[in-house]
Amino acid sequence: MSVLTKQLIYDIYVRLLHLNEQKANTSLQQFFKEAAEEDVIDVPKNMTSIHVIDCIGQHEPINNTGIFRKMNLSKANVTKISTKLIKEGFINSYQLTDNKKEVYFKLTRKGRQIFDLHEKLHKKKELAFYQFLDSFSQDEQNAVLKFLEQLTSRLEAEQTDDT
């Protein structure tokens, strides 16, 4: 591969990172808009809280350690977010009868509304992404898959090195 091609790939990668940052802000506004259309009035104010609700909804019952492992957040951040979500009425905490040490979380009715809306929006985006992938041959999809797997592994390793 030529140096020019490598530079082009890197430039597009950096552009993708910037677009992803911008998209995060747009996604939250889109979520608020969809929530209003569905008459869901009370919505968490950031996407991380919405994603914690999603994680809890997918894995009930789940504790802080489970959330931190599945979402790659710090334990302190998970504790802060879960405390806020309890206070705001999106989740409840409880202990299992056979384990009084661990605190587990489950969604409230209000949290379930957020979970359901988030799932609906993700399904819509997932379908659009699959349709986009259909424009590539199987060999091209395999190359993209290999690239993304290796890039993700590298970024995860860098993140681990930074902590």
For every predicted segment, state its role.
Residues 1-44:
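N-terminal leader segment of winged-helix/HTH proteins
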Residues 2-9, 120, 124-163:
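Terminal interaction helix/tail motif
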Residues 13, 23-24, 43, 64, ...:
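Gram-positive cell-envelope targeting signals
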Residues 14, 18, 50, 65, ...:
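Generic detection of well-ordered alpha-helical segments
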Residues 29-73:
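N-terminal helix-turn-helix DNA-binding core of bacterial DNA-binding proteins
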Residues 60-103:
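Canonical helix-turn-helix DNA-binding module
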Residues 86-138:
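Charged, amphipathic alpha-helical coiled-coil/dimerization segments
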